């Protein structure tokens, strides 16, 4: 399902973002 991909991307993108 796309939700798994969505949450995986969110989980990776949020800390990156915060670091940048």
From Swiss-Prot:
Entry EC number(s): 2.5.1.18
Q: Coiled-coil intervals in this record?
A: none
Record-level Gene Ontology MF annotations: glutathione transferase activity
UniProt: glutathione binding residues: 6
Which EC main class describes this enzyme? transferase
User: Could you tell me the superkingdom of the organism this chain comes from?
Assistant: Eukaryota
Q: Which residues cross the membrane?
A: none
Q: Which reaction does it catalyse?
A: RX + glutathione = an S-substituted glutathione + a halide anion + H(+)
UniProt entry tagged with the keyword Transferase? yes
Q: List keywords of the entry alphabetically.
A: Transferase
Q: Which residues form the GST N-terminal domain?
A: 1-20
The free-text function statement in the UniProt record for this protein reads: Conjugation of reduced glutathione to a wide number of exogenous and endogenous hydrophobic electrophiles.
Name the family: Belongs to the GST superfamily. Sigma family.
Q: What is the protein name for this chain? A: Glutathione S-transferase 2
């Amino acid at each position: 399902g796309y939700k798994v991909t969505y949450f995986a991307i969110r989980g990776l993108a949020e800390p990156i973002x915060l670091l940048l």
